[in-house]
């Protein structure tokens, strides 16, 4: 989602990176959208800028001299809890997951020569407005298709419909990923709340209508996206981070739910988790048809409001 209209003017973005070229690219991009922008070369300079004018959001590199992005994140959270903060790195985000978990960080962008500014704008726009839900934010103007699932037994049919959208552009992981997300939503979102254990769960167990799972999908010329939503909001950001951490021995190999999320992130180009605790959980996957120009590393998007 990129904010449009005159609303951007009330938001300011502070960009923190020791690479002037990165600061300029992002400053030009956000200025072009109508945001007020500022720049700093490291965390210490960023804090000095914040004392002069508190920004709406800070986008900072992780590796910087004087003060790195993790320490800056910690200080901002402590002193300025109202400031949104997104980290960015040119390295593998997964290598930072233990550190990310320690600070409960949910949003990390991947920078590089092929900086995906559309994704940057969508991520920042959603964080600023708090309007994080909905596949349409990533596929504006595209027709959305929707299915309601009241039993896991319907998963295969829905997965097949979605895969058909990729006719002529087969993807070996899309079916698996959607099925994993539906299974997680059905059990952990609905049946678990109803007191049904995994041992009692059958594929044809029916969910009552108010707890049904919604699957939405859309595609454009470049990619296909799928959103799986449950109305319970049982997933916690801290658990999602733990399950995604490949170095945590207490995670995926012990829990089906965690293993599924780990596999989805590993094999899908973009994985976004949106959580409103106790109200709804939405997992969005986006798979590109042509990966030749994709950055080798993936961003991290876990939003909990």
Predicted regions and their residues:
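Helix N-cap/capping motif at the beta->alpha junctions
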Residues: 39-48, 69
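Bergerat-fold GHKL ATPase/HATPase_c domain
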Residues: 110, 121-176, 187, 191, ...
């Amino acid at each position: 989602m990129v904010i449009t209209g005159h609303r951007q003017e009330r938001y300011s973005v502070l960009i923190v990176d020791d690479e002037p070229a990165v600061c300029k690219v992002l400053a030009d991009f956000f200025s072009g959208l109508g945001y007020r922008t500022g720049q700093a070369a490291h965390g210490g300079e960023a804090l000095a800028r914040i004392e002069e004018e508190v920004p709406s959001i800070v986008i900072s590199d992780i590796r910087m001299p004087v003060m790195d992005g993790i320490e800056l994140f910690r200080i901002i959270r402590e002193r300025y809890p109202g400031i949104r903060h997104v980290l960015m790195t040119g390295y593998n985000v997964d290598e930072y997951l233990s550190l990310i978990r320690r600070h409960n960080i949910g949003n990390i962008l991947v920078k590089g020569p092929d900086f995906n500014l559309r994704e940057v704008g969508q991520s920042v726009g959603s964080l600023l407005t708090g309007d994080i839900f909905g596949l349409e934010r990533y596929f504006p103007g595209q027709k959305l298709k929707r299915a309601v699932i009241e039993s896991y037994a319907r998963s295969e049919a829905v997965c097949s419909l979605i895969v058909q959208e990729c006719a002529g552009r087969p993807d070996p992981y899309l079916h698996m990923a959607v099925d994993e997300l539906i299974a997680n939503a059905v059990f952990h979102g609905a049946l678990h709340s109803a007191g049904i254990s995994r041992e009692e769960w059958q594929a044809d167990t029916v969910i009552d209508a108010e707890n049904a799972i919604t699957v939405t999908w859309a595609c454009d010329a470049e990619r296909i996206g799928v959103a799986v939503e449950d109305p319970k909001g049982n997933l916690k950001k801290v658990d999602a981070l733990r399950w995604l951490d490949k170095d945590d021995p207490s995670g995926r190999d012990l829990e089906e739910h965690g293993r599924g999320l780990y596999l989805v992130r590993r094999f899908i180009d973009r994985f976004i988790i949106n959580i409103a605790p106790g109200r709804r959980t939405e997992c969005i996957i986006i798979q590109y048809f042509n990966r030749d120009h994709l950055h080798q590393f993936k961003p991290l998007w876990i939003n909990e409001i």
